[in-house]
């Protein structure tokens, strides 16, 4: 027996397809939209359609953008000799929030994951290597996540880049600011020790 009418059921099903959205959350979202005024619903649907139509990948860094090249690649005040390699566009946003990094980015749009059937050729690695051949780069900062896949991807890229005479570094991993040592796992503590620096 179907509890909801066709349009509501379809809306719930569509929301359920989103990552991290289960059936109950999909129902809450669907009913929230039903209770919104028509203008707000139309604005939401237009924003979704516009984002899908207008967002593309930057031809230089492979980040998402609505202009090509993106604003970061076309910003002459950024240091083009240092490239920070990240997994996805959300990582660029996280790095930018620190206001510490003044170089450029390269977005891989994923990591090597044989278990998920994702090989190096499915990522934006070839574009990175081409970019390094066209641009004078002194350092690549590998800022992939500290997962098995992130580490494997960083090592794979490092092996490709080192013969080009470019310095390859890895962001430090370790204890979060404000975290207690006693609650940290062994891998985190090991990474914190490896990444220690003189004060």
From Swiss-Prot:
Q: Which residues form the Toprim domain?
A: 81-176
Q: Which InterPro entries does the record cross-reference, listed alphabetically?
A: DNA_Rcmb_RecR, Rcmb_RecR, Rcmb_RecR_Znf, TOPRIM_dom, TOPRIM_RecR
Where exactly are the zinc fingers annotated as C4-type? 58-73
Q: Which GO terms describe its biological process?
A: DNA recombination; DNA repair
Q: Does the keyword Zinc-finger apply?
A: yes
Pfam family membership, one: RecR_C
Its domain of life?
Bacteria
Which keywords does the record carry?
DNA damage, DNA recombination, DNA repair, Metal-binding, Zinc, Zinc-finger
Q: Name one GO molecular function term.
A: zinc ion binding
Q: Does the keyword Zinc apply?
A: yes
Biological function: May play a role in DNA repair. It seems to be involved in an RecBC-independent recombinational process of DNA repair. It may act with RecF and RecO.
Q: Which PANTHER family match?
A: RECOMBINATION PROTEIN RECR
Against NCBIfam families, the record matches this protein to: recR (TIGR00615)
Family, according to the entry, reads as follows: Belongs to the RecR family.
Protein name according to UniProt: Recombination protein RecR
